[in-house]
Amino acid sequence: MQCNDVQATEPDIKVSLTRVGVTNLKKLVKLKRTNKRDIVLLPTFEVFVDLPSSQKGIHMSRSPEVIEEVVENILLEKEIYGVEDLSVEIVMKLFEKHEYATRAEIMLYSDYMMEEKSPVTQKDSQEIGKIIARAYGVKDENGKIHVKKMVGAEVVGITACPCAQNMLKENAVTSLKEKGFSNEEIEKILDSVTIATHNQRGIGTVMIEVPNGYTVGISKIIKIIKDSMSGEVYELLKRSDEAFVVETAHKNPKFVEDCAREMIKRVVDVFDYLPEDTQVLVRQVNKESIHRHDAFAERNSTLRELRDELKTLTN
């Protein structure tokens, strides 16, 4: 008995859909690295294709089948070194399996283990960041497929609020004056102590388009994010390390907007070799300690726009 292809039938409501697919799909992936051992990841995949108004549904099983085939076969046959290149392979395969699709997209997220040392005692510890890849393909009217790919990272750090710190500094000045200290003495005291403020756990994200013929190092992106907050966080901290982390953050207070702008400037400086039309996404989310809400800042732009803005500021 032959089964009808229900997905290929016409829907009751003839409206096209932008993205249909599967999310929260995990697969073990092994990627090659130049002159280093292979890296093993357990990424989460989200894969989508568009659906025309004339078709009831996509062939859903084909999407996880694509990932299975790419992971099991293509990775063995090809030397794939980056998650962004893996994403491109999956997008191209999605078009093969979903012949009715004119758009295909994949998002990939994976924990990324980094070897770090605590800042003072130099204790070894494993720190976890998150690497991200995205590929987006469009099939033109001639059947040619155009794919863009992006790679990025998400890193946790610490931020210290400049506003509360400034208010506490003003309170300290007033209190010291009432106790009879001179302005010179007050200045020396304030230079010798760390002024308190409230902190946030900051989550920085940078995504950068990878044009054909170019490479974008994930380790460089991770460093940009780390260096753009008030300070780094560590899994393992002894007492002297903890004091160092807290003091460092309080001596480098930053708003959520400051972190986002710092990442933008560092991206422009570090990736000065990338073309003008390269797409860049920068996002900072600060988990507030004295509020129930979070603070958020984001910029989605091209390198040309960012370079022009920064150039205007320096002139």
UniProtKB/Swiss-Prot annotation:
Pathway: Cofactor biosynthesis; 5,6,7,8-tetrahydromethanopterin biosynthesis. GO terms for molecular function: GTP cyclohydrolase I activity; GTP cyclohydrolase IV activity; iron ion binding. Keywords: Hydrolase, Iron, Metal-binding. InterPro entries: GTP_cyclohydrolase_FolE2/MptA, GTP_cyclohydrolase_MptA. One of its GO terms (biological process) is tetrahydromethanopterin biosynthetic process. Its EC number is 3.5.4.39. Pfam families: GCHY-1. Its cofactor is Fe(2+). Binds 1 Fe(2+) ion per subunit. It comes from the Archaea. The record marks 161 as: May be catalytically important. It catalyses: GTP + H2O = 7,8-dihydroneopterin 2',3'-cyclic phosphate + formate + diphosphate + H(+). Homodimer. Belongs to the GTP cyclohydrolase IV family. Converts GTP to 7,8-dihydro-D-neopterin 2',3'-cyclic phosphate, the first intermediate in the biosynthesis of coenzyme methanopterin. This is GTP cyclohydrolase MptA.
